[in-house]
Regions:
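Nucleic-acid substrate recognition interfaces
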Residues: 1-385
Length: 385
């Protein structure tokens, strides 16, 4: 079994320059391969990885592209393999048509393969192709490294994601089973009686984020107009490209740091909650939510996107696979909130999200909306085991 582990690396200036150059080269090769396949497709011809790989070989011999020799050759080939995989997913209707990669995307990455032990850990350093030994922060022991993805974030931090061999040990058997109903106010309510409040990290940082984003927008608008207004006076500003304006780039980094903090807080929360549920329960029953459909509700879309249900469910699923637990899913349109968990009566009035408590007209049971839904989800899940 394989898993990905992420560590921060601290390349020196020459290593940073080479990483950035490799990112640019991989993007160039990917885009050239995509353009070649697109043109062939438009002309009724079908080409694949073999033809684009031959194109790369030709470019390396061209003096105009001499800089390709400085980049990791395996990473260049891998960018074409990734392109080929993207086309295969497209033709199987598992994804959209591949898009060209932009140098303006602030998060960039490339992937390289471990061949002949050219990727290995030595003390506080990791050896990477072309880069040599790069200082990194290892926080856990890992198995054999299969491949590595080198990432540069929007805040100019560098990371490696190592795909490693992993042999998980199954957790001790427990008789505990649990059903959970996810929500926006409470992240989830469980049949155990536990409820976890939605931390709302985005909402808590929204005021500061909006302020810094407005500040960045004003700086960009002033730069484009060529003038900066102070009071009643207008002052000319530099005519450098945006990428060379240090103050604008500093402000962009401020905005990116806020986004990064929100992402890190959310990921930490999701990891801890998913691990807790996996450790304590043998069977976990969840809803098979159509999140993309729920996002069509524009009033709730921002909150639904922020709460990250899909990511949480994904974590539960792969951790259950690792540690010998069982995840069951109630069907997408199962009316878990409307059904009485005691007698099975379906109360369509409960479709109204404002109704948080209700009394079953059939058996008289008083229900908390979310707890009742969690019980129904568990019962449905157990029936599917």
């Amino acid at each position: 079994m394989n898993k990905g582990v992420k560590f921060r690396i601290y390349p020196n200036k020459s290593q940073q320059s080479l990483i950035n150059q490799t990112l640019g080269c991989c993007r160039l090769i990917y885009n050239k391969g995509l353009a070649m396949r697109k043109d062939s497709f438009d002309n009724g011809l079908k080409i694949g990885y073999k033809e684009t790989s031959a194109m790369l070989t030709g470019l390396k011999k061209d003096n105009e592209y001499f800089f390709l020799k400085d980049a990791d050759s395996i990473a260049l080939q891998q960018s074409l393999r990734d392109l080929d995989s993207a086309f295969k997913r497209f033709f199987k209707k598992l994804g959209g048509y591949p898009n060209f990669k932009s140098k303006h995307n602030h998060n960039q990455s490339y992937r390289t393969i471990n061949q002949g032990d050219n990727i290995r850990i030595s003390g506080k350093y990791i050896k990477l192709p072309k880069l040599g030994y790069v200082k990194f922060k290892q926080s856990m022991d890992i198995g054999h490294i299969n491949n590595v993805t080198v990432e540069r974030t929007s805040t100019n931090k560098y990371f490696v994601v190592l795909n490693v061999d992993f042999e998980p040990a199954a957790l001790p058997f427990t008789s505990k089973v649990i059903g959970i109903d996810v929500g926006l106010k409470e992240f989830y309510k469980a049949t155990s009686g536990d409820s976890v409040t939605n931390p709302k990290y985005l909402e808590k940082s929204s005021k500061k984020l909006a302020h810094e984003q407005r500040k960045l927008s004003h700086m960009i608008e002033s730069h484009i107009s060529g003038y900066k207004t102070i009071g009643n006076k207008r002052f000319p500003i530099c005519d450098k490209p945006l990428s060379e304006c240090k103050n604008i780039q500093k402000q962009r980094k401020k905005v990116a740091l806020i986004h990064e903090k929100i992402t890190n807080q959310r990921n930490d929360f999701l990891q801890k909650e998913s691990t807790k549920l996996i450790r304590e329960n043998q069977i976990i029953s969840i809803e098979d939510l159509n999140v993309s459909g729920l996002l069509q509700n524009h009033k709730l879309a921002k909150s639904i996107s922020s709460v990250s249900w899909s990511k949480f469910f994904t974590m539960l699923e792969y951790k259950a696979k690792w540690y010998g637990r069982i995840i069951t899913k109630a069907p997408t349109f199962y009316p878990s909130s409307q059904m009485c968990s005691c007698c099975g009566y379906k109360n369509t009035d409960v479709k109204d999200l404002k109704i948080r408590k209700w009394i079953c007209p059939e058996c008289g049971t008083v229900h908390d909306r979310d707890f009742n839904a969690a019980v129904n989800i568990l019962n449905k899940g157990l029936a599917l085991v």
